[in-house]
């Protein structure tokens, strides 16, 4: 392998000749191989950094802080970072300095060398300097949290929201299709008064819509960026208008309302906005766990379970039991939820660990958040495509359970009173008789009265046509 010599304030470092990174990235590679098999800095952060460095170069050009030739080359190189053309030049891991300095310098060095190359200068020449030019008016302490928030917002919009909204649409369509199917309601895992299958599925759509709205509301906090705060929040070495311009250019680049944080001291020292978003993601994940468990129970069987719905049989379920089919999508989804719950705890703890002017748990916080967003998006899309869209009612089983449901006696409360209705239920259960038969034998109602009062659809929709 051929090498070139790069230099930083600590001396000379050998860097692979075909890599755009420089001395500080190489030092990090040598000192931090922690979790390299898996925990590479997320490319979402790199893309966000590309947007940030492009916006910074535009701002510095407008403010007269950079020569036009240098600024234009930085912008072109940053656009290549955004497009993913330079992904192989970002090898660092999540487990590094807590401010993300090494990743910031990785981006600075790659853009500086690529910009120098664009201008016809050799790699390592520092014709475009990683600190003086690419990082002008910036610190890792304000750029990394800015990239964190931009990356997280973009991940929500690109990975999570479309998947969840697709599942909501599927459930709403199923709810309309199943609205005329009356079934047993269940509370405490016990039989309760009837509902329609459409009402049950519709409740899943509503729960997801509510929890997704919580995530979207929490997301608004991430629009407040630390950029312009530099090292401790004072804005030292940055033009007074720099942060405002960068935020404006980021908003233009993304189409999202990014702005400078009202208090940049707090924006460096704490990341409560990200903690809030993770809490909302945990709530959404909890809703998915509940819905998944409902579906797993309702589809259980084929003979020993509830079996009121059919779900797609996607693959054989057992290596020893022929013909067995398992609800695999409903099992994979809760595992993702468990992962998100764990990540929420990691982000919550890391968010509490700011000291004075800086929180130094930034990389692990954003890695956990991005993993959660992407896992949830993937799991929900898979669940929708391979399970939810294929849910169908088992009408025979639904009717069987409904006809045996003793809680239909609730309809008799107004006619004969709670105590007599309870007596009918006890007799029906004890003697394994239908509710109607027990009522007639006790003499509390005639057959005509029973049939007029106990109408399952009216119990499921008591206020329609009232």
Curated annotation (Swiss-Prot):
Q: Where in the cell is it found?
A: Cytoplasm
Indicate what this protein is called per its UniProt record.
Answer: Fumarate hydratase class II
Q: Which residues form the active site?
A: 188, 318
According to its UniProt record, in which pathway does this protein act? Answer: Carbohydrate metabolism; tricarboxylic acid cycle; (S)-malate from fumarate: step 1/1
- The residues annotated as site (Important for catalytic activity) are 331
Q: Lyase: present as a keyword of the record?
A: yes
Pfam families given for it? FumaraseC_C, Lyase_1
Plastid recorded as keyword: no
Q: Which Enzyme Commission number(s) are on file for it?
A: 4.2.1.2
Question: CDD domains, alphabetically?
Answer: Fumarase_classII
- Identify its protein family: Belongs to the class-II fumarase/aspartase family. Fumarase subfamily.
The entry's keywords: Cytoplasm, Lyase, Tricarboxylic acid cycle
Family matches, as InterPro entries: Fum_hydII, Fumarase/histidase_N, Fumarase_C_C, Fumarate_lyase_CS, Fumarate_lyase_fam, Fumarate_lyase_N, L-Aspartase-like
Q: Which GO terms describe its molecular function?
A: fumarate hydratase activity
| Annotated catalysed reactions | (S)-malate = fumarate + H2O
Name the gene behind this protein. fumC
- The organism is Thermus aquaticus
**Record HAMAP family:** FumaraseC
Protein residues bound to substrate: 99-101, 129-132, 139-141, 187, 319, 324-326
GO CC terms, sorted = cytoplasm
Q: What is its main location?
A: cytoplasm
Q: Look up the further comments and give them.
A: There are 2 substrate-binding sites: the catalytic A site, and the non-catalytic B site that may play a role in the transfer of substrate or product between the active site and the solvent. Alternatively, the B site may bind allosteric effectors.
What Gene Ontology terms for biological process does this UniProt record contain? fumarate metabolic process; malate metabolic process; tricarboxylic acid cycle
Question: What is the protein's quaternary organization?
Answer: Homotetramer.
Instruction: Summarize the protein's role.
Output: Involved in the TCA cycle. Catalyzes the stereospecific interconversion of fumarate to L-malate.
Superkingdom per UniProt: Bacteria
